[in-house]
Design a protein with these regions (language model features):
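Short glycine/serine/threonine-rich phosphate/pyrophosphate-binding segments
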Residues: 29, 52-56, 81-84, 106-113, ...
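C-terminal charged capping/lid subdomain of soluble metabolic enzymes
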Residues: 2-8, 314-396
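Generic secondary-structure signature for well-ordered alpha-helical cores
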Residues: 37, 64, 68, 92, ...
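A short, small-residue-rich loop immediately preceding and capping a beta-strand
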Residues: 91-129
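Active-site segments that bind and position negatively charged phosphate/pyrophosphate groups
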Residues: 205-207, 211-330
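A glycine/threonine-rich phosphate-anchoring loop and its flanking beta-alpha core
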Residues: 20, 116-219
């Protein structure tokens, strides 16, 4: 017998999207020039000054060795319209064939926003495994200056042409970034299920207008299976990968988590859709200036995931998530998010932002600002209660 989702799918046009190439391995960055020369003879390389100091030499030597000219642009830390316009001007003035984004999610989102609308090849080289930005056709835009507030998420008509992940580079990054990637990735198991149950689309579209996808296509059931594999991989390898990251070494578990954080997570969210966890995670950015220390995307989404689990899955699943999250160091309370003096006014700011997100539109139910605030407060109390039973591991 066919399940209801399969039967319903006969009435829809469905779609699936993915990056053109995904390449991962220890030391692969030294082959970057060989890999990208298929896209042309001249590149714009975008990274911040710290990343250039760490891996810029390997990137530049590889491009020179394989005959790829390049102009190196230092990223200004925030993926904003101001920064996108600045880098686009440099790319067009130099007649480059490709944009190579080297660094974290904001760098790569900026590189995509420069390359894809201008029909340049987009090559993503993550130096941390903290988000699924490398594989997706989405850029998240923030205000200036850094750290900015969330403005919008824009959709592109194609995914990056290539993603090159050097696990030796990933292993040398602070272990916190790996945990953040897992925090982002774990949300997709719950969000994909919620989106399917609501019969809503993901981020695959028939057409694109004004940086927006229009005529969304319904997903196949593949994202559900990817999200399940993703969550199982995080549970099986997360703790061991964190130990490897703390020691700055590449192990099979670290390879599996990098693959999960980057490829599996990207395929799951883009084809399966995002929901309440990301609505809350993104909206918590309105409180970033109060957070001490500043929290990363995956940390805020981890708290959002706890809220979604309590709203849709119940206490048993919430406790399982808290235990796992604390085992790798992720926050599950306001205090762990660096919000030691959070007020109702603060939470209502978050709630109003939640209701303005595209993720909110994918919910199977309507929730008021009062309900969103109440859900966050409940998640905080549950996080405090059960977090004591499963102490939070340090990142380093």
């Amino acid at each position: 017998m066919f399940d209801p989702i399969t039967i319903a799918s006969t009435f829809y046009i469905r779609g699936f999207r993915a990056p053109g190439n995904y390449i991962q391995g220890r030391g692969v960055l030294s082959y970057l020039g060989k890999l990208v020369k298929r896209y042309g003879r001249k590149a714009l390389v975008l990274s911040d000054s710290d990343v250039r100091r760490i891996v810029g030499g390997v990137v530049e030597e590889s491009l020179r060795r394989f005959g790829v000219e390049y102009v190196y642009v230092i990223f200004n830390r925030e993926c904003s319209w101001e920064e996108i316009n600045r880098v686009t001007k440099i790319a067009l003035e130099n007649s480059v064939d490709m944009v190579i984004g080297v660094g974290g999610g904001k760098t790569m989102d900026t590189a995509k926003a420069v390359a894809i609308p201008n029909e340049l090849a987009a090559v993503m080289v993550p130096t941390i495994a903290s988000t699924d930005a490398p594989t997706s056709a989405v850029s998240v835009i923030y205000t200036e200056p850094y750290p900015g507030e969330f403005v919008e998420a824009i959709n592109f008509h194609r995914n990056p042409d290539m993603v090159v992940v050097d696990t030796e580079v990933i292993a040398k990054a602070p272990a916190r970034f790996l945990a953040c990637g897992m925090g982002d990735a774990a949300s997709h198991y719950w969000e994909t299920r919620a989106v399917f149950q609501a019969n809503k689309p993901g981020y695959v579209f028939m057409d694109y207008e004004n940086r927006r996808g229009v005529e969304p296509l319904k997903p196949f059931d593949l994202p559900l299976h990817i999200a399940k594999l993703l969550w199982e991989t995080l549970q099986k390898h997360g703790v061991a990968a964190m130990h490897a990251a703390k020691l700055k070494i590449v192990t099979p578990s670290l390879e599996q988590i990098v693959y999960a954080n980057t490829l599996l997570s990207g395929l799951a969210f883009e084809n399966g859709g995002t929901s309440l966890a990301h609505a809350i995670g993104n909206s918590l950015s309105v409180l970033e200036k109060k957070m001490k220390p500043l929290q990363y995307h995956g940390e805020m989404v981890a708290f959002g995931t706890l809220v979604e689990i309590l709203a849709e899955g119940g206490l048993e699943y919430a406790v399982e998530f808290i235990k796992w999250a604390h085992s790798i160091g992720l926050p599950v309370t306001f205090e762990e998010l660096g919000l030691r003096d959070v007020t109702d006014e603060d939470l209502y700011k978050v709630a109003e932002k939640v209701k303005a997100t595209s993720e909110y539109q994918r919910l199977a139910y309507e929730i008021s600002s009062d309900q969103i605030v109440a859900m966050m407060k409940v998640a905080n109390e549950i996080g405090k209660k059960y977090g004591q039973l499963y102490p939070r591991a340090p990142y380093e």
